[in-house]
Amino acid sequence: MKLVTFSVSTQVGEVVRIGALHRDFVVDLCAAFGWHLCERGVYAAPELANDIIPADMVQFLSRWPMAREAAETAFSFARNKGTQALSPSGAKIFYGPGECRLLAPLRPRRIKDYLVYEEHKKQAIKQKGLDLPDLWYRMPTYTNRNHLGLAGPGDDIAWPSYTEKLDFEFELALVMARGGRDIEASDAMEFVAGITIYNDWSARDVQADEARIGAGPGKSKDFDQGNVLGPCIVTLDEIDPSNVEMILRVDGEEWARGHTRGMKFSWQQIIENASSGETIFPGDVFASGTMDRGCCLELGRWIEPGMRIEMEAKGIGILSNRIVGSRPA
């Protein structure tokens, strides 16, 4: 499944739901599951459906694997009913283009952003006149991100007022469905719900200043909408996270291509590292770091306000955002 969080306009305002993509439609999984339970004669079917498939993705993941099984049942049930079907109460099950808005698929508990692409790291530290140390190859390393500074597919991204050099970073990220501690690499993927696209925005001039004083990323990455996730979470029965082709476009022009083959540490090693001596939780997001040539810094080409950034990952979809606002005066 391709799991999404979406909103629908109603007379009482925006209502947020969990869904799954079916061609150009979004299936309301809770509504479909409630109808399924009703047909089976379950008392209080809508209430039970809301309990098992809640409107919040992190809460949904916390009910894994029961919630996943319910979602799969609902998805199959809805497809059998057809895209024009309405529930006995008149509720829509399918939403077509323009009838709903995709949001970030989840509001993560936290984001750990790893750096496992060798060429990207080499280029990043080359800007500082340094070489990649042997120590980098011993274990995957990460920095924490502001999980509250979040945006989703289609959102306009405001150019931060304090930077001259805004940069995107094309990454993929695993979304966790189970919690645990000291997880071995051989068991790691059993804890994963799926994979999504992650854009880690960076203010490069500010980042350079922070590096000069020996500080980790601060305001260079910590601003509203600085983390973009979407368009969906693809469950692992539909995709191999270690075999994903990525295409970067700016205003429709292809700027770069990449592949998860460039990762020097595996997803399993990332999870093993993240959980070492530390409990991880459903709704945690672990990102790969930028694909090789997946940012302006490496490409030597810089974006401007008004440009649209498209990050396509085969098997996942396209994460598209436009930059609005202006550079500081």
What residue spans do the PLM features occupy?
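A short, polar/proline- and glycine-enriched secondary-structure boundary/capping micro-motif
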Residues: 37-43, 267-269
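Short beta-strand segments in beta-sandwich/barrel cores
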Residues: 26, 180-181, 321
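Surface-exposed flexible segments
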Residues: 17-25, 300-301
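Short N-terminal binding/cap micro-motifs at the start of the first secondary-structure element
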Residues: 11-18, 28, 320
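A short acidic, often aromatic-flanked loop/helix-cap motif at beta-alpha or helix-coil junctions
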Residues: 34-36, 329
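Catalytic-pocket segment enriched in acidic/His residues
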Residues: 14, 69, 95, 202-329
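Catalytic Cys-His active-site segments of thiol-dependent hydrolases/isopeptidases
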Residues: 26-33
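Active-site microenvironments in enzyme catalytic cores
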Residues: 1-12, 21, 32, 42-254
